[in-house]
Amino acid sequence: MQENTRLRIAIQKSGRLSKESIELLSECGVKMHIHEQSLIAFSTNLPIDILRVRDDDIPGLIFDGVVDLGIIGENVLEENELERQSLGENPSYKLLKKLDFGYCRLSLALPQENKFQNLKDFEGLRIATSYPQLLKRFMKENGINYKNCTLTGSVEVAPRANLADAICDLVSSGATLQANNLKEVKVIYESRACLIQKENALSKEKQALVDKIMLRVAGVMQARESKYIMLHAPKEKLDKIQALLPGVERPTILPLAHDEKNVALHMVSKENLFWETMEALKEEGASSILVLPIEKMLK
């Protein structure tokens, strides 16, 4: 580790959150050189060290105050929190921001040939999972007795290998379940990536840097959700055209050279503009419609 004056951020070394975590930091202006085998990357323009670790280790690094910030899936965070609590500890952290990537769900799944009516169908079954604490909490809340089978990977093969009757695993598209002759029957937890901070107070300098990063994260996320729209519109149809566009702020209206009937409208839309909306705009007389991505945005 470098000197403690540098902000330490833990991210997943490899896996589904790794690439998008690096992209987020880069879009926030954190310049760094990532080497595949290196566990630490040093920012070249900000006093920040990026620690690349297993995702299961990130919550503990935050709970124990080893790192200052972490980007982690809510499922891993809460599983580790419940595990610490089961050992009599009281882990703490600050949730700074839920992020716009890493979406998945933790679901119960059964073999395709099994009939499913309700959760009582899981009574007494042996369930394989990598998230025993989240599963235990859900089953307890629903009054279901079951047998736990904790696996650290390849959970979906457990029924076929006669290790378990059912599974509780992460699902994104469902393709892996189908490939293993399983069907998703109940979502027990919805998850996405989040940015967390250790509970202990940071130095004044570090906190100022965190505040700056949070402002940039908000700007990046807002830019991803927004589009810059430019079009020409008849003056008499402005109200109808604006009603079709969900804007962040009031649009900018500009005169067109040598055209008394039409104006140019520029605005930031907070939603993606679908073809149906563009067609509706055209029906109201709009023309020269341009929809552009926004790289950065600060309100």
UniProtKB/Swiss-Prot annotation:
Q: InterPro entries under this entry? A: ATP-PRT_HisG_long (IPR020621), ATP_PRibTrfase_cat (IPR013820), ATP_PRibTrfase_CS (IPR018198), ATP_PRibTrfase_HisG (IPR001348), HisG_C (IPR013115), N-reg_PII-like_a/b (IPR011322), N-reg_PII/ATP_PRibTrfase_C (IPR015867)
| Needed cofactors | Mg(2+)
Q: Which reaction does it catalyse?
A: 1-(5-phospho-beta-D-ribosyl)-ATP + diphosphate = 5-phospho-alpha-D-ribose 1-diphosphate + ATP
UniProtKB keywords: Amino-acid biosynthesis, ATP-binding, Cytoplasm, Glycosyltransferase, Histidine biosynthesis, Magnesium, Metal-binding, Nucleotide-binding, Transferase
Sorted alphabetically, which Gene3D superfamilies does this protein's record hold?
3.30.70.120, Periplasmic binding protein-like II (3.40.190.10)
What is the stated purpose of this protein? Catalyzes the condensation of ATP and 5-phosphoribose 1-diphosphate to form N'-(5'-phosphoribosyl)-ATP (PR-ATP). Has a crucial role in the pathway because the rate of histidine biosynthesis seems to be controlled primarily by regulation of HisG enzymatic activity.
Which NCBIfam families is this protein grouped with?
A: hisG (TIGR00070), HisG_C-term (TIGR03455)
Q: What is this protein called?
A: ATP phosphoribosyltransferase
The organism of origin for this protein:
Campylobacter jejuni (strain RM1221)
